[in-house]
């Protein structure tokens, strides 16, 4: 069972108990590092269609003509891909997509579905129409790895679009996706082993780096280009000496900040996007408009202004325990004005 923010608060009250009882509580659960600060969300989405552990990963699509009309694509891994406006209202639901992770580059949306192709996994490729803000399915790409997580990358060197499906076995694949109109040609260009289970990933066009979250270990940094091989460095670790708590989940960037979600401690670490230096840790607490983000899987962020609601950008987190205030019930996604974070770290 994840150590939620509410549970963590109740555990802290145990310090008033006798020393022996408090010691039992302290040794029964992993130590949780304190956050540097909390922020609150101003918007939350409608709950996903399925109950239980269903919502997982958000991806932001910025409208090319009117950023206030941007949308968020969210996965419901029990059987739907959903599209929300910036007020959190559902605009579209695509049934039958068991995507666990999703990412966007330009007008191309790709989800990683580990139940597709008879359980072997596939990438579902869509195009988003700016006029309707709806997704159109283009192609399913069976993958060699059982696609669990995915991120996209538009190479500054070649202009080519790449997808990186990855799996709970630790295998990572790189696919070139040539999208022309409604036609998609997919070519596998790299395959490597990152170790144990991976899921969260982020490919950064600003520095050519591919960030991979090995859930129980930490975040690795590879080269994003297809010829980069398997050389890697470690951004940060779980456990002693690191700032992350397993499971290492979502990874996203906005402006000069890189964010990583630690599912086991219900918080988010922040790094300098250029140097990789650790900057701090924050949580998303309950506020007037929405409850907190707990047991978070995926995250996304952008520093692009999205109209009056998010003039300096937005940070989005999946909430594994959706309660009051606001909508409650099935899991959903919370929207935090980005400056509430970047003004403090």
Q: Which residue stretches match the model-derived regions?
A:
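Sequence/structural signature of beta-propeller domains
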Residues: 2-9, 32-345
